[in-house]
């Protein structure tokens, strides 16, 4: 299987082409040695991960099935999970208060496990707009939002949003009134942030499911606001 890259106006698209014909047979227990792909050389850390994983399995400290299940759980983490939590807080003031006071407990009761790290929920209001960044790397509440977007990890965003947040927000189409304070929060290795956006006007008659459908990932990072299209 070869990964082919092609340039487009939106960046690089990855397509797969299978030009490796398997004309030879494999024994059931046969293992291929790790080989570098054309576009993805095996780095030191990838080799170390593979070696440690194989050693743990060999020593019966963990099974391949347990690793697979954990990867599936990680892959299931998507922004829609966070959107459901936000929508619930808009519909239920008691849950909202719990979410702000003790996010881990509230989210666990809602049905998601956010792990051992500290999570702080930042509520946007008419007077304060919160936006999240990780200036050092890409720390991000992956348990409820999935993987961070590429722009969140970029050096440009990480360096500019702390210096000129309003300008950066404008580039996302978000114009914050000068009467509203913009606060930038820097995530760390042991602490993450989740923005609780303001509920959009005109959504009073909407159901919790309908509200959740309005909430995008970027609003929970703080670079956009939630609106009714």
Regions found by a protein language model. Give the residues of each.
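N-terminal amphipathic/basic-hydrophobic helices that include classical n-h-c signal peptides
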Residues: 1-13
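Terminal, compositionally biased segments used for targeting/anchoring and flexible tails
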Residues: 5, 15-229
């Amino acid at each position: 299987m070869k990964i082919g890259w092609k340039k487009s106006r939106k960046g690089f698209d990855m397509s797969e082409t299978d030009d490796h014909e398997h004309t030879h047979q494999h024994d059931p227990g046969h293992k291929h040695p790790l080989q570098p792909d054309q576009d993805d050389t095996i780095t030191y850390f990838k080799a170390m991960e593979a070696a440690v994983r194989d050693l743990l399995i060999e020593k019966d400290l963990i099974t391949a099935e347990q690793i697979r299940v954990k990867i599936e759980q990680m892959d299931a983490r998507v922004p829609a999970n966070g959107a459901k939590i936000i929508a619930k807080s808009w519909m239920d003031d008691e849950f909202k208060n719990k979410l702000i006071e003790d996010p881990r407990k509230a989210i666990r009761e809602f049905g998601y496990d956010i792990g051992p790290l500290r999570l702080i929920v930042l509520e946007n209001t008419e007077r304060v707009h919160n936006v999240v960044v990780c200036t050092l790397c890409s720390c991000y509440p992956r348990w409820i939002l999935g993987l961070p977007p590429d722009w969140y990890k970029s050096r440009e965003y990480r360096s500019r949003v702390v210096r000129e947040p309003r300008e950066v927000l404008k580039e996302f189409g978000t114009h914050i009134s000068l009467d509203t304070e913009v606060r930038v929060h820097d995530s760390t290795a042991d602490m993450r942030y989740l923005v609780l956006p303001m509920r959009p006007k005109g959504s009073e008659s909407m159901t919790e499911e309908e509200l959740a459908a309005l909430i995008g990932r970027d609003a929970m990072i703080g670079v956009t606001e939630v609106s009714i299209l």
